[in-house]
């Protein structure tokens, strides 16, 4: 196989695949930045993403008869979307509202979560199926969500909870206490 054949059969499809994976992943990251209100970061990511898109699309449109180029383009988009979702989980920007709903007295649960640094607000309500319920509202950094959910599923498996993204929080609001040792360890990814 000469270098020209290798380039058109293997190298260009591989380049297209890698470019599309990067471009689709960057699109996921850009969407996250937009939804969290980080307009400047979204713009910078959009510039890079568009440049990659132009190159990969240009390589495909140059010769539409090359099946492997088209296949690499499509496969790269799918793989990049999955990778983008994984990146979103890793960067965990922002906060979420967690609502815990329980028909029983939540005082033990609140004490346990409070000792772990979680702030919360409790209100009483009436459920259509369970009568009297307590609803506990918590605003939690997304980076802490998996820790909170593992505690809830392990220690309170029957607890009903819902989770929603938060767009903005008042600056200076104390919603989560993290002791200095944990803050230092989390800086190093521990």
UniProtKB/Swiss-Prot annotation:
Provide GO CC annotations from the record. plasma membrane
Q: What is its main location?
A: membrane
Membrane-protein topology = Multi-pass membrane protein
Instruction: List the keywords (alphabetical).
Output: Cell membrane, Membrane, Transmembrane, Transmembrane helix
Tell me the InterPro entries matching this sequence: DUF2179 (IPR019264), DUF5698 (IPR044035), UPF0316 (IPR022930)
Compartment(s): Cell membrane
**What name does the UniProt record give this protein?**
UPF0316 protein Mboo_0605
Say which species the protein is native to.
Answer: Methanoregula boonei (strain DSM 21154 / JCM 14090 / 6A8)
């Amino acid at each position: 196989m000469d270098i020209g054949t290798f380039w058109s059969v293997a190298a260009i499809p591989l380049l297209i695949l890698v470019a599309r994976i990067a471009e689709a992943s960057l699109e996921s990251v850009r969407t996250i930045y937009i939804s969290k209100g980080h307009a400047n970061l979204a713009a910078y990511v959009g510039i890079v993403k568009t440049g990659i898109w132009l190159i990969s699309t240009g390589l495909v449109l140059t010769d539409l008869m090359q099946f492997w180029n088209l296949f690499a383009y499509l496969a790269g988009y799918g793989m990049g979307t999955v990778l983008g979702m994984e990146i979103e989980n890793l960067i965990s920007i922002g906060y979420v509202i967690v609502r815990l709903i329980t028909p029983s007295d939540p005082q033990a649960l609140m004490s346990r979560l409070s000792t772990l640094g979680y702030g919360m607000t409790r209100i009483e309500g009436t459920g259509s199926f369970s009568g009297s319920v307590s609803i506990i509202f918590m605003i939690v950094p997304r980076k802490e969500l998996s820790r909170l959910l593992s505690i809830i599923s392990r220690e309170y498996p029957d607890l009903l909870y819902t989770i929603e993204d938060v767009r903005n929080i008042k600056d200076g609001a104390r919603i989560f206490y993290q002791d200095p040792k944990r803050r230092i360890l989390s800086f190093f990814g521990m």
